[in-house]
């Protein structure tokens, strides 16, 4: 089937070209194997004499011929040889180095001499060294402090404030050991010491309250009264 153009309408020519390109692609013909001319005909780009064919069916029949197939083999053979010669310099250098490899006998001799010159065995990362138990380090004894520093430290320790309960007990003991007291005063003093030792604290208003830092066994809110004779 042929498509002949009538007139000089460029729009019709473009439509015709699109249709021919579509037909060419529909026939699975590579673009570099066929050329479409301006008059709508096809030229074979593989054959050396460039045959011009009117229709796509004629081009398909030409591509099935023996001459075209032989030309196709030559065409792709030249392409393959061209690709082989277009190697980069790095690949060429690698090929040269591979061609200049040493003889296996020389390589084996060099390896034997290197192994003979090695005195220490090769290190293997898989082997672990056995740790020997180290001797305990000698304990360094601190030098004795001078006598003056010892005296200063003992003086500072003696100056530390004593707990409140101990100071109160000492004061009460000093009061008891001092001048003789009447039985009433002694009973009041003993009651005071009993309350202080039980966790009661005077609030400064003549009352006794529980110390927050002391735990009581009972829930009494008032301290025990002064015992009678």
From Swiss-Prot:
List the Matrin-type zinc finger ranges: 42-74
Q: Which GO terms describe its biological process?
A: alternative mRNA splicing, via spliceosome; RNA splicing
The Swiss-Prot or TrEMBL record annotates one GO molecular function as: enzyme binding
Q: Residue spans with biased composition (Polar residues)?
A: 82-92
Which residues are recorded as modified (Phosphoserine)?
2, 182, 218
What do the Gene Ontology cellular component annotations say? nuclear speck; nucleus; spliceosomal complex
Checking InterPro entries in the record gives: SCNM1, SCNM1_acidic, Znf-SCNM1
> Motif Bipartite nuclear localization signal: which ranges?
4-20
Keywords, A to Z?
Answer: Isopeptide bond, Metal-binding, mRNA processing, mRNA splicing, Nucleus, Phosphoprotein, Spliceosome, Ubl conjugation, Zinc, Zinc-finger
Q: Does the keyword Zinc-finger apply?
A: yes
Q: Where is the composition biased (Basic and acidic residues)?
A: 157-171
Pfam annotation, one family: zf-SCNM1
Please indicate which superkingdom the organism of origin belongs to: Eukaryota
Q: What is the annotated localization of this protein? A: Nucleus, Nucleoplasm; Nucleus speckle
Required for interaction with LUC7L2 as annotated region, ranges: 187-229
Q: What does this protein do?
A: As a component of the minor spliceosome, involved in the splicing of U12-type introns in pre-mRNAs. Plays a role in the regulation of primary cilia length and Hedgehog signaling.
Question: What is the disease in the record?
Answer: Allele R187X is a disease susceptibility variant, which modifies the severity of the disease jolting mutant (medjo) caused by defects in Scn8a. It reduces the abundance of correctly spliced Scn8a transcripts below the threshold for survival thereby converting a chronic movement disorder into a lethal neurological disease.
Q: How does it assemble?
A: Component of the minor spliceosome. Within this complex, interacts with RNF113A, as well as with SF3B1/SF3b155, SF3B2/SF3b145, SF3B3/SF3b130 and CDC5L. May interact with LUC7L2 and SNRNP70.
Q: What is this protein called?
A: Sodium channel modifier 1
Which organism encodes this protein?
Answer: Mus musculus
